[in-house]
Amino acid sequence: METFFIETLASDVYGKALNVDLDRLSQAQVKYTLQELISYCSALTILHYDYSTLAARLSVYQLHQSTASSFSKAVRLQAAQSCSRLSPQFVDVVYKYKAIFDSYIDYNRDYKLSLLGIETMKNSYLLKNKDGVIMERPQDAYMRVAIMIYGMGKVVNIKMILLTYDLLSRHVITHASPTMFNAGTKKPQLSSCFLLNVNDNLENLYDMVKTAGIISGGGGGIGLCLSGIRAKNSFISGSGLRSNGIQNYIMLQNASQCYANQGGLRPGAYAVYLELWHQDIFTFLQMPRLKGQMAEQRLNAPNLKYGLWVPDLFMEILEDQIHNRGDGTWYLFSPDQAPNLHKVFDLERSQHENAHREFKKLYYQYVAEKRYTGVTTAKEIIKEWFKTVIQVGNPYIGFKDAINRKSNLSHVGTITNSNLCIEVTIPCWEGDKAEQGVCNLAAVNLAAFIRENGYDYRGLIEASGNVTENLDNIIDNGYYPTEATRRSNMRHRPIGIGVFGLADVFASLKMKFGSPEAIAMDEAIHAALYYGAMRRSIELAKEKGSHPSFPGSAASKGLLQPDLWVRCGDLSSSWEERVAQTTQGVLTRKSWWQLRLAAMQGVRNGYLTALMPTATSSNSTGKNECFEPFTSNLYTRRTLSGEFIVLNKYLIDDLKEIDLWTEAIQQQLLNAGGSIQHILDIPAEIRDRYKTSREMNQKILTKHAAARNPFVSQSMSLNYYFYEPELSQVLTVLVLGWKKGLTTGSYYCHFSPGAGTQKKIIRNSEKACNADCEACLL
């Protein structure tokens, strides 16, 4: 595309504000289509991120040319379609208040989307007709979500509709993928995450296949507990036959997942969880593999995600074996012969003989009664786990006892598994009054509160409160695929508020991950997030009542989430002073004591925060994912929408300030695959600040996780990044995380060669843990 027009356009754009007349540009195309211009500008991103910005604006302009110019018209055109997905009630609300909605919506805000963002919106979130033609703009989608939240009940709350639209369209907050593409439709399944517990009887085994398939078809991600299924070759008294164990059942769920895709928009997404004492643990650990005997015999199930539910007892035995203090003996059981091991947990970690350790007590009781069906060592299990992690990045590790002992809902029942991305932890069970866990997710853009004089913690608190009310309304307005999901959600009313853009905050404030000030700020940010959510949930309880399972909860006793960590010995009692100092008095000891007293009177939601992956939100807004460091300073992001070059704009701005963003530096950055650690022309201070997630010591990620985890009601999707697959390195951070009381041991463990050995732009598909994991991505 070597024309005067394109070269002039490129030179005008480079490093400038991009005040481009898109109508004039479109008329001047002559022989080139808008799509060709978009592709060309995107390819020039390596020179400057402004090229990507222009490509995004061209893409938005292209969409605007083919869609309705007002919100009500867009809705009218969709409603007129023979196979319209829109709910008649939603359409009626839009028609009734169309003057307000049409005048308030601001289509110019579409031009704030990144290229990755607008293309993701086109591909996944914007409603289409039966022929696949896009029928709305991003602003229409934001308004549709806002109306779904505040306009579908008994009262149409115009004020809150407009406020929510404003927060969404300015990218201060985001709602989860199912909410985005199902809001306003005839079957509004708005929830992201579902947790199922599979019982050991044929009827329930197949019921869970059906239930998971129905949930997946509506866009939900699923976590299944398999720990209660009897092991292979166990006797079945009813039939006189032997059990097939978990292997065939996992393969059945694997096939179901592949068939039941998420509304045709993306593949289905299931995670299966198992406890380490289960006799079939070694089979379970081999099933995700793409290579090896089971894979060659097609006895694997590689489309599923896998998770281990790890008790303290196993970690203690493993640590003793590592340090030659014990032989690592670990007993294996079949749950039909050793029942309820997955239904109990250790309330304390103490080794004192009177400590409340129900799991440990029952485990050794079954050992004494010789109910075990096999004996191995803790090291053998962890080695087998590691072989699989090297290939596929999981099984995840969830610390069972930490999750349960720090749960506000520990009085409800034992948490036996998590969800697709190991950040949601809700009790679930089958049988009488079955409950299937459900959680609605949203996230706050931390970068939205960066100010010239520091960080706006008050703004973050307010935004967290707004999201809390949004999610609470979604609980009442959403569609539930089963009565057990409705029962659980109405009883506990759990929500999961996450974050994205933490790395953007640190880069803007010139902090580096791992520094004392960064760790303190990480703690303070998540304290503010939790505080804002709890404060608003208390206010909502006064207006609408507490969640039915509130009596007996930790909050009903005046215990906040960080108090549970103090009680367990994993957080110092001085945390309030640290937060007060970091927030410069926005949150004081008095603030927290007032919150405790108010919480005892009632709380609307059983859970408040959960730190999920946020790949889609990050794509849309140009911010870094969740709480993670930058994975690279230059990479190609693979999504369902295609491949897009992403450049770290903060690094570019810092280099421009010192006149170092030159062609030579650009080429070195490209040759190094996005790393600047060996570009010695760049000052050491900048190189240190822009270490990527893989280049920094992984203990830094653990320490940051330990700082924020006390303010997380549920858990977090904690990734680790390593150059080489060395078990000792991985065990170091896992044991450190366990000792610090983390609830998640690991989400994905990524391994790859050093960036300096790569001569092409990093193809960073790992950044989002694969596109099929997006059910709980935002």
From Swiss-Prot:
The record marks C193, C439 as: Important for hydrogen atom transfer. One of its GO terms (molecular function) is ribonucleoside-diphosphate reductase activity, thioredoxin disulfide as acceptor. The keyword Disulfide bond applies. Keywords: Allosteric enzyme, ATP-binding, Deoxyribonucleotide synthesis, Disulfide bond, Early protein, Nucleotide-binding, Oxidoreductase. InterPro entries: NrdE_NrdA_C, RNR_lg_C, RNR_lsu_N, RNR_R1-su_N, Rrm1. Disulfide bonds join C193-C439. Under complex allosteric control mediated by deoxynucleoside triphosphates and ATP binding. The type of nucleotide bound at the specificity site determines substrate preference. It seems probable that ATP makes the enzyme reduce CDP and UDP, dGTP favors ADP reduction and dTTP favors GDP reduction. The record marks D200, R230 as: Allosteric effector binding. It catalyses: a 2'-deoxyribonucleoside 5'-diphosphate + [thioredoxin]-disulfide + H2O = a ribonucleoside 5'-diphosphate + [thioredoxin]-dithiol. Induction: Expressed in the early phase of the viral replicative cycle. It is an enzyme of class 1 (oxidoreductase). Substrate binds at S177, S192, C193, G221, N419, L420, C421, I422, E423, P613, T614, A615, T616, S617. Its EC number is 1.17.4.1. SUPFAM superfamilies: PFL-like glycyl radical enzymes, R1 subunit of ribonucleotide reductase, N-terminal domain. The record marks Y747, Y748 as: Important for electron transfer. Pfam families: Ribonuc_red_lgC (PF02867), Ribonuc_red_lgN (PF00317). GO terms for biological process: deoxyribonucleotide biosynthetic process. Heterotetramer composed of a homodimer of the large subunit (R1) and a homodimer of the small subunit (R2). Larger multisubunit protein complex are also active, composed of (R1)n(R2)n. NCBIfam families: NrdE_NrdA. PANTHER family: RIBONUCLEOSIDE-DIPHOSPHATE REDUCTASE LARGE CHAIN, RIBONUCLEOSIDE-DIPHOSPHATE REDUCTASE LARGE SUBUNIT. Ribonucleoside-diphosphate reductase holoenzyme provides the precursors necessary for viral DNA synthesis. Allows virus growth in non-dividing cells. Catalyzes the biosynthesis of deoxyribonucleotides from the corresponding ribonucleotides. Belongs to the ribonucleoside diphosphate reductase large chain family. This is Ribonucleoside-diphosphate reductase large subunit. It comes from African swine fever virus (strain Badajoz 1971 Vero-adapted). The lineage of its organism: Viruses, Varidnaviria, Bamfordvirae, Nucleocytoviricota, Pokkesviricetes.
